Amino acid sequence: MSKPAIYVINARERDRIPHENVPVAAIHAPMGAREMANPKYRKDWGYSFGNEIGRLAQGMPGRVKGTDTLKFISYADMPMDRRRDCTYARIVCNCRPQKSEVNRTRVTVGGNLINCPFDCGTPTTDLITVKILINSVISTPHAKWMTIDIKNMYFMSEMKNAEYMRFPIDLIPPEIMEQYKLQDKIHNGFVFCKIKRGMYGLPQAGLIAQELLAKRLGEHGYYQSKRTPGF
């Protein structure tokens, strides 16, 4: 039996391909903020983007619960010595037909502009260690294996030093503007936020989340090997 054809569809191609001709196995290539601002897609993707901002901030009533990862502030509330470090928001949109929320928007931090004053390398288990563990499981009669995906672990990791990020005002959905009263916070075409917890793209986010995980597991008798990082 032959495998189904797979189409890679980006925002520009989507209107040219009849929906009935696209197989279930279709993969939708991510599109960026510029394409999201296109009037053709703004309504659908604006709603998705609103959910993502609400998830990162203090929520959107009736839609998503916030994680208090970031907080919108006025430009004047940003410390003078941190304004040079203010980075950009990278916005990525993707279609995930297998998910309950098909149109998915994610915001990551422009980490290349972050000045981290400490070594933010994260201890990581190497591939050989993982292979040894898996081989041990499959070689042991009646052994069972379990993996756990921790939701919002990055977003729940407090940072000692806050970071700052900006959003172009023309991409912010109207309901977000109203909910967070952003009209009064516009400065030179941007709104600004204070990042209080870990976010994808922050160079220190992985280390902070790993340290928090080690602390939580330590309360139940688990500890990290001194010879094998991440184990």
Task: Give the location of each predicted region.
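Chromodomain-type histone methyl-lysine reader module
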Residues: M1-F231
